[in-house]
Amino acid sequence: MLQKVLLGLLAAVVALLLSPSVRFKFWNLNSEQENQKTDQNQTSFSDFEDLKRKIESITGKIIQMPNPRFIDSYLDSLSWTSNINIQTYELTEKNIKKHLKKLAEAGTQIRIMIENQKYQQYQNTFKQLQKEYAETPNIVIKSDQHMKTMYLHSKITLMDKSFWIQSSNLTHSTFAKNREHLFRSENPKILKNLTQLFEKDRSGKMLFRSDLHPNLVVCNINCREVITHLLSWAQHSIAIETQYLTDPQLFDILANQSEKLDLKMIFSNTESVSDLPSYFWNNKVRLMKKPYLHTKMILIDDEILLLGSMNLSANSLDNNREIWILINDPALIWEFEKSFAQDREKSNEM
């Protein structure tokens, strides 16, 4: 009797399982990885016109280095805020460190994220800052060791009502020796988004394309997609001023575009660019010796300017944390075009 009952129950269960009206939901034990796969299949922009429609017009100032006198203005920009969040590859400039200590002692809450194992590292700045600020209240230093990136190479400083995005580290060379570009803005949407990204990186949470404001280009999230599309979408001109070019995909795109449009590039006069092939003819490439070219700037069709921390290398695009911003302000673009022309005049033909 019991056997018949059990067989009957089993038959009922099987019938229920096979019923087309029954649906089952299986919980994903690794939803973060699934979200990442879905996110990677999305695109930021469908074409150049879509990009121009989606990005916001952002006002601000672009400051060109070297300019040793600007250090005072930079310090002043940090002075009137209750919170400072810094994400950088390097922080060694003594005046900035002293100023941060003074601000923290006066009550400003300061959080610093910095690379822990720099390429060709001569000193561990993370440990050095921990030591210097050990007795200073209101300063918290955190490395990138918990992040799923190779290098924390982004360079942003966030205050209560404004932010800096820059090509430069917070070093003496930035202000005294290097060609760098620093962008400051009070745009509240970008500031809010950068703060959210900072919090996610600080806590080790994964970033997705859906986390990003349309004007932000973040490695290793959407930067390869955005930069390859922009270079490919260019119709009239591309102007690049950056430290070097080593990424094969970007190289191929630029080589192809060089036959179709006005391509002008300025690189640092170092061994890393000596292997650029000779088919970049017609004076398309110039090499700058002084000041040392450390900036990372790209202008597409005189309409879209990219400024930030990313070098044109596979490591930067695919492995590092890098942050760029898309700028479409005609006045800021005109300023860059003017300085680019001046740098090109004093650079050597390849």
Predicted ranges, named:
Residues 327, 331-350:
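Amphipathic alpha-helical interface segments
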Residues 228, 239-246:
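Long, repeat-rich segments with strong aromatic
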